[in-house]
UniProtKB/Swiss-Prot annotation:
Catalyzed chemical reaction(s): [protein]-dithiol + NAD(+) = [protein]-disulfide + NADH + H(+); [protein]-dithiol + NADP(+) = [protein]-disulfide + NADPH + H(+)
Family of this protein: Belongs to the thioredoxin family. DsbD subfamily.
Protein species of origin: Salmonella choleraesuis (strain SC-B67)
Record-given protein name: Thiol:disulfide interchange protein DsbD
The enzyme's E.C. designation: 1.8.1.8
GO molecular function, one term: electron transfer activity
Amino acid sequence: MAQRIFTLILLLCSTSAFAGLFDAPGRSQFVPADRAFVFDFQQNQHDLTLSWQVKEGYYLYRKQISITPTKADIAAVQLPAGVWHEDEFYGKSEIYRKRLNVPVTVNQAAAGATLTVTYQGCADAGFCYPPETKTVPLSEVAAAIDATPTPAVTQTGETSKPAAQLPFSALWALLIGIGIAFTPCVLPMYPLISGIVLGGRQRLSTGRALLLAFIYVQGMALTYTALGLVAAAAGLQFQAALQHPYVLIGLAIVFTLLALSMFGLFTLQLPSSLQTRLTLMSNRQQGGSPGGVFVMGAIAGLICSPCTTAPLSAILLYIAQSGNMWLGGGTLYLYALGMGLPLMLVTVFGNRLLPKSGPWMAHVKTAFGFVILALPVFLLERIIGEAWGLRLWSLLGVAFFGWAFITSLQARRAGMRIVQIILLAAALISVRPLQDWAFGSPSAQAPAHLNFTAISTVDELNQALAQAKGNPVMLDFYADWCVACKEFEKYTFSDPRVQQALGDTVLLQANVTANNAQDVALLKHLQVLGLPTILFFDAQGQEQPQARVTGFMDAATFSAHLHDRQP
């Protein structure tokens, strides 16, 4: 009996030893992609279901899912909505967790037809896998008699991309509308509009006057909401084209021109002939009656003054660029409601609530010009990157706070000195990014990045190891789709402690963004599951498995790792 127990213990120990012998070098805490994202499919005639079982702590990117038919015709693929995930470098993305099922309608499939499915995912711990590609064999399916053939195109997560978000909350549109009400083209008109809404009657109950004013505002809001829905619907049809850099640059130029019109460089409004026709239509309506007042409000929404044309055009263009219909209609409704609130107050309480007209109204108009100038920066930031985007924000901040400071010098009210100090301080703070760019900053004296030598194949790696001349070697795997790789560049490799620790190390880097055949071969040769992965080789060109790094490390942790690795 004792001999059997001893034999069993020996067998278990030997099994453990053999398992350790055949473990991958630098055992990783992360599982292979096939275990992180278990892919399966099932076809029943025209109905095909693609499914992924996503391991806990991992997720798939919605926009990275691509479905391409070969010798087959499929209907447009509608990917289900995911959950929002945000990171520093790529902003908001939709992801899938736990399980994903994608129904695909196969209109027709010839003999030997296949479906190529590409997907990509990451781990919450900051480890991303290269794009995975699976080939799904399709059963032969005859086309339905009434089916309309469609071209075989690639269906991706981008085709059903959710509507983009506006750079501001829709509630800000309410505040913008209220602000526009105090411009020189709008505020002086409110007493006149109030009299027209009431039908020239001076003695109406407060409730009746409030009801008529509310109906007028709702008529105006209906027009603006319809404009917002039309703009969003039009933008949704051309969503991909509206994200093209040339289109973004064109929109930025248009927004800049709209802002210049708010600065008084030129006047932007509807043609006078069209305004006259709309005014005549409005005058035919009977004031004091709910129906007539509603129509008057709806027509008033189309009559844009020089102060309202530019802000309205800017909001419409950005809504079209976002393609979000719900947000588009809601934003314009709140904008109209904001413009109508002062009118409702004037109608109920009279002119005594209105501030006196003066130069301050022109200043309000100019301030909204700066608000519109923020939109080109939002758009251009997608093209020129974070660094230049920060400089544009800096330039806009200096211009706005500088203008506000100069304007405040004309005021004689008590307490304006405090406001002037605050504005001047804000301008000085805003200029810092421009100052660092123009004259350099102390932090820029240290090299921002390590000096890597690029390699792309196994042969190039072997050659680089042979040329290391007895020095240790570090090989970093990088890809544009790897968020943690960018974090390594920005936070870890730029640290002086890390750079000092790597002073005598030969630095190699393999960029596997394309994930082509040679990239796959290199990853397979070195048994790299995903990114970021950093390998270390000794002076003889042999990898140090225990020193392998998978996943992100901050500068302090990575520096300690470099000191602890085997020589």
